[in-house]
UniProtKB/Swiss-Prot annotation:
GO biological process: translation
Gene3D superfamilies documented for this protein: Ribosomal protein L14
PANTHER family, sorted: 50S/60S RIBOSOMAL PROTEIN L14/L23 (PTHR11761), LARGE RIBOSOMAL SUBUNIT PROTEIN UL14M (PTHR11761:SF3)
Keywords: Ribonucleoprotein, Ribosomal protein, RNA-binding, rRNA-binding
The protein, known as: Large ribosomal subunit protein uL14
Family per similarity comment: Belongs to the universal ribosomal protein uL14 family.
Keyword Secreted: no
Record text on subunit structure and interactions: Part of the 50S ribosomal subunit. Forms a cluster with proteins L3 and L19. In the 70S ribosome, L14 and L19 interact and together make contacts with the 16S rRNA in bridges B5 and B8.
Annotated GO CC locations: cytosolic large ribosomal subunit
Task performed by this protein: Binds to 23S rRNA. Forms part of two intersubunit bridges in the 70S ribosome.
InterPro entries the UniProt entry points to: Ribosomal_uL14, Ribosomal_uL14_bac-type, Ribosomal_uL14_CS, Ribosomal_uL14_sf
GO molecular function, one term: structural constituent of ribosome
Entry superkingdom: Bacteria
Length: 122
């Protein structure tokens, strides 16, 4: 469950290390984002030679949350951290590698490039 001012680790090699959620996209009064949702975020920590710089405002898709997500079959899935993958204007990932597992909900949200780059889809 991601809301405004939530800090997330970045699960790709775009150069950013940590982002802070500014806004959850999808509806005017939408408060929370979960796995597979797109957010607008500000880069808080970044590598000096990365593609993404500190202070940049980016779009990102949430790939892991500490708060459990209930699946249609009744099972729950939760992760050890809150993580996101930074997107470009075409909703494709900026990085070329994804670190750590991603939730299956990312596939249902049609982010197939992220699913194919991920080492594990849970």
């Amino acid at each position: 469950m991601i809301q405004s001012f939530t800090r997330l680790t970045v699960a790709d090699n775009s150069g950013a290390k940590e982002v802070m959620c500014i806004k959850v996209l999808g509806g005017s009064k939408r408060r929370y984002a979960t796995v597979g949702d797109v957010i607008i975020a500000s880069v808080k920590k970044a590598l000096p030679n990365g593609k993404i710089k500190k202070g940049q405002v980016v779009k990102a898709v949430v790939v892991r949350t500490k708060k459990e997500v209930q699946r249609d079959n009744g099972s729950l899935i939760r992760f050890d951290d809150n993580a996101a993958v930074i997107l470009d204007n075409k909703r494709e990932p900026v990085g070329t590698r994804i670190f750590g597992p991603v939730g299956r909900e990312v596939r249902y949200a049609n982010f197939m490039k992220i699913v194919s780059l991920a080492p594990e889809v849970l």
